[in-house]
Amino acid sequence: MKTLYDDWDTWQRLMSMLEYQFGSNCEIILHDLTKDYNHTIVDIRNGHITDRNIGDCGSNLGLEVLRGTVQEGDRYNYVVYTRDGKILRSSTMFIKNDEGNVIGCLCINLDITETVRFEEFLKRYNSYEIEEDNAQSILPTSKKHAEANTVPSDSSSNPPSDSEVFANNITEVLEFLIAQADKRAGKPVDELSREEKIEFVRYLDQKGAFLVTKSSERICEHLKVSRFTLYNYLDLIRKESNTNTETNKEE
């Protein structure tokens, strides 16, 4: 397979199967990552879940894969909190061509917001005290398994720093990455030293921010540095990265 369209009928049938199997609370998206990243969605079912349509952009995780920061980008059964308060149970599978290059990805976002709330309700409703001798008769067989499958109930909490963000255009994704870099820095841009600004740029580079068209202009504006200075930072970062790669190979 060279492109997604070489097997387009199969992808369409697979998406239809998933759509009918999981119903309207499950969003299924097919991305063509050979396109402009601002318009990667080539098919989407139940797009109301993340408010996206055909022609919208991919998430920040796809940028990391294209940048090469993440070698094996497949992720299964992880939790994402959307900006409008939804809790999603998500999986992402990247699609490669015959040469092993990433050309697309298939994503599933199952809205579990209401079931998580119902789970919390049941915990409160079933609150009780039991004698230790009778504990085995009512507690789960594997407490560890039950705890491992518990999803945090506070959908208003801030997403973790490596969270996935769903957006209608790539500018929103870039702004999200800049905001995450700000959080990591922990201080206003005006107070950042040269070394801290380099780390700021290093983070954005690892996240694939510079794959976004005209991202350099926005990042220069945010850091209050010239384009010349920004490119000097990038040159330094990538030289260090290449040196580390060569050292690891020798070892």
Task: Please tell me what each predicted stretch does.
Residues 215-223:
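Short alpha-helical "recognition helix" segments of helix-turn-helix
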Residues 1-8, 21, 110-187:
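Juxtadomain coupling helices with adjacent low-complexity linkers
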Residues 61, 65-124:
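Sensory/regulatory domains in signal-transduction proteins
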Residues 16-77, 81-83:
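Structured interaction and signal-relay segments at domain junctions
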